[in-house]
């Protein structure tokens, strides 16, 4: 298989959600283009970028969507979540309010996205450790309680950015491939594929055969 961008085995849509200013756009640009913009302004509307990675010899193309966390853009919610198989729920470790709003974002995600979506809680801007307002253990406990994976990242110095996307994409791939194997097994076990002939021995009597069925 070549390395062209249009050659892939799986295409996974992953959305970035969270308050405005937590660094979603820089996480996107750092992972897909290895770029960081210190003067990055809030995203207006929606944008997405792609990058392909290898998992178990398969090419996974990630289509990562980013939208503004500002309330006035929430009208795009339904289209934004449609088809998403993964979500990074991002907060700023130096701004406790962005962490407090995680619960609301999680509810919105579960209201609009597929029930099987894979969710990772991401504490971004870990380089601001001297300004930390959200303890790591507190966020990790919240993630465990709500069935989310958890990681802290820094788009500025690239800490754990690769790991965050690799982890969620690998988890999605495992779920999808296991489902495909399960579906294949079910198909193999279906009656049409497992027809067992039943041989009825002939009767010794010369009675005429009954051609109809009778309810008892």
Curated annotation (Swiss-Prot):
It is a lipid-anchor. GTP binds at residues 20-26, 37-38, 40, 42-43, 69, 124-125, 127, 155-156. Keywords: Acetylation, Cell cycle, Cell membrane, Cytoplasmic vesicle, Endosome, Golgi apparatus, GTP-binding, Hydrolase, Lipoprotein, Magnesium, Membrane, Metal-binding, Methylation, Nucleotide-binding, Prenylation, Protein transport, Transport. Belongs to the small GTPase superfamily. Rab family. Residues 183-207 are annotated as: Disordered. The keyword Cytoplasm does not apply. GO terms for molecular function: dynein light intermediate chain binding; G protein activity; GTP binding; GTPase activity. A motif (Switch 2) lies at residues 67-86. This is Ras-related protein Rab-11A.
